[in-house]
A protein has these predicted regions:
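ATP-dependent carboxylate-amine ligase
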Residues: 1-13, 17-20, 30-36, 42, ...
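Well-ordered beta-strand positions
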Residues: 36, 61, 200, 235, ...
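Short, conserved loop/helix-junction motifs that constitute active-site signature segments
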Residues: 55-57, 75-77, 194-197, 227-232, ...
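Short secondary-structure boundary segments
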Residues: 64-67, 183, 205, 240, ...
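Acidic, Mg2+-coordinating active-site environments of NTP-dependent enzymes
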Residues: 69-75, 198-351, 430-440, 507, ...
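Phosphate-binding loop of NTP-binding sites
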Residues: 91-240, 244-253, 504
Length: 512
């Protein structure tokens, strides 16, 4: 306890200084004996209101602010030391690193990926490539957490700081060699990766999203750029296909390796040739000193070429030589790994795909990726927009769907506490305005609830058509007015296809 007091500038009196602290928690319901309970101010209640439960569960001490201390002074139970600091959130990350000993010079080697789109797939690609290299790996991300064993469900793209450091400590105990982590802008803003030092940080792209949090693209960029500073990363790999990547490459505070998927944007590594192969792509990656790597990804879309290329260059930046990496690419085909809810194929005829595309850029790329070359094939898309999020992207998503699909079925995503009909109306307005202004030949429908929309898409589909169900990907719950309703797009799509007599693909990750 004394070392914790020293770290936050608080003197621990008497015998309390010898109290052992073995963990840290922000949630009174997850406190274990020996934990430091951090009582933070919340949107409705202060964490200090729940200190009694934390102490009863075995909390060794409480860390809070002045407001929390005043609430604790009213409590009859002050049997544990109380540490008071001005901004407790600011010290949670460093304290977590100290308590779990997950600081700068400890294993595993850590790869962090940020950007608007592609974080999940890139971290899966990194993990798969590292495994092909014979390394034991971990993963922290939107879909799951892996620590060398069975998958652990994840509710946040990046968990809270104590959980992140606890997971890194667990990975060290399991003697894992490396881990890949998604790093969202929310995680940086809410200090969930404070105290974490990434060996290699990677940047995918930046497009409109999360402006409900960041308000402007400049603010959004500034948050992402915080990852590329000496306090958070040793090296960086930056994709410079967009202006934000080029800006980041020029301003990052750590050594940068650049990557481009086009010769139009000069970079250290460039995708120089692409050849379609099945659903995926074979491509060459040309780098310094005339180095050329032959790479294949089995996932469709030019964006997955970018994701695979970023994974390759990040692993190279992590210290693997090009010849060893090429051998792993040849032997393991690591970028054909299935990523749940990311361009996930449920049926081949009709082609039926579920993808997480939930913003304008991702939806456009997904629609372009799944469009069949068959001249008589129609593209049917089912999607909606999330409630209580950036409202400006709703009509833009509707317009993009109208331009790129033959049949647009607008439905509900996660309304949260917003009116679902109002959200649909925003998306519909964009689709119908584009349809009228640009004289687009598409059909625009409004169908709800979401399972009915998926059924309608299947009813309309012929064997040579394509169905894209976009926006939710791997998610298995739909939040409506504070209630979580069971809803998995993959399950609904498989069920509707089966009912119509189509042969669906088997996947043990889809629980039908």
């Amino acid at each position: 306890m004394e070392s914790i007091g020293d770290a936050v500038g608080v003197v621990i009196p008497g015998a309390s200084a010898d109290v052992a602290v073995t963990g840290i928690s922000l949630n009174s319901r997850t406190v274990e004996p020996g934990d430091l309970y951090v009582a933070l101010p919340g949107a409705v209640r202060h964490g200090a209101d729940f200190a009694a439960q934390a102490i009863e569960a075995g909390a060794a001490a409480v860390l809070t602010d002045d407001a929390g201390a005043r609430l604790l002074a009213l409590s009859s139970d002050t049997s544990v030391p109380v540490l008071v600091v001005d901004a407790p959130r600011n010290v949670v990350g460093p304290l977590s690193a100290m308590i779990y000993r997950s600081g700068q010079d400890t294993a595993p080697q850590l790869f962090g990926v940020t950007g608007t789109n592609g974080k999940t797939t890139t971290t899966y690609f990194i993990t798969s490539l590292l495994r092909s290299l014979g390394k034991r790996t971990g993963l922290i991300g939107t879909i799951e957490i892996l620590a060398g064993g069975d998958p652990i469900p994840s509710l946040l793209t990046t968990p809270e700081s104590p959980e992140v450091h606890g997971l890194l400590a667990l990975m060290r105990e399991k003697e894992l060699d490396a881990a890949a982590m998604e790093v969202s802008s929310h995680a940086i803003s809410y200090q969930r990766v404070d105290g974490v030092l990434f060996d290699v940080a990677g940047f995918t792209n930046l497009t409109q999203d999360h402006l409900d949090l960041h308000h402007t693209m400049d603010d959004y960029f500034a948050t992402k750029a915080e990852l590329f500073t000496p306090a958070r990363a040793r090296k960086a790999v930056v994709t410079v296909d967009d202006e934000w990547g080029r800006r980041l490459a020029g301003s990052a505070g750590v050594p940068v390796t650049t990557l481009s998927t086009s010769r139009a944007n000069p970079a250290d590594w460039t995708v120089t040739e692409t050849v379609p192969r099945g659903l995926g792509t074979e491509f060459t990656l040309s780098g310094p000193g005339g180095t050329v790597l032959a790479v294949h990804t089995g996932l469709p879309g030019s964006f997955n070429v970018a994701n695979a290329a970023l994974a390759v260059v990040m692993v190279l930046a992590g210290g693997v030589d090009a010849a060893t990496l090429q051998a792993a690419l040849d032997a393991g085909d690591p970028f054909t790994v299935a990523v749940p809810g990311r361009m996930q194929l449920v049926c081949e005829r009709p082609a039926a795909v579920v993808d997480f595309a939930h913003n304008t850029d991702a939806l456009a790329r997904a629609l372009e990726a799944v469009r069949s070359p068959e001249p008589d094939s129609r593209l049917i898309v089912v999607f909606g927009a999330t409630g209580q999020r950036d409202q400006g992207k709703r009509p833009a998503m509707g317009a993009i769907a109208a331009r790129l699909a033959d049949t647009v079925i607008i439905t509900d995503d996660d309304p949260h506490d917003e009116d679902a009909a109002a959200i649909r109306a925003d998306v519909l307005a964009g689709a119908r305005e584009a349809q009228e202004r640009e004289e687009l030949p598409c059909t625009v429908l409004e169908v709800f609830p979401r399972d009915a929309a998926i059924q309608r898409a299947v009813e309309l589909a012929r064997p040579h058509d394509t169905i894209l169900v976009a926006g939710r990907g791997h998610e298995v719950w739909q939040e409506v007015k504070g209630v979580n309703l069971a809803l998995d797009d993959r399950v609904e799509l498989r069920s509707a296809l089966t009912a119509r007599g189509f042969n669906v693909l088997q996947d043990d990750r889809i629980e039908s």
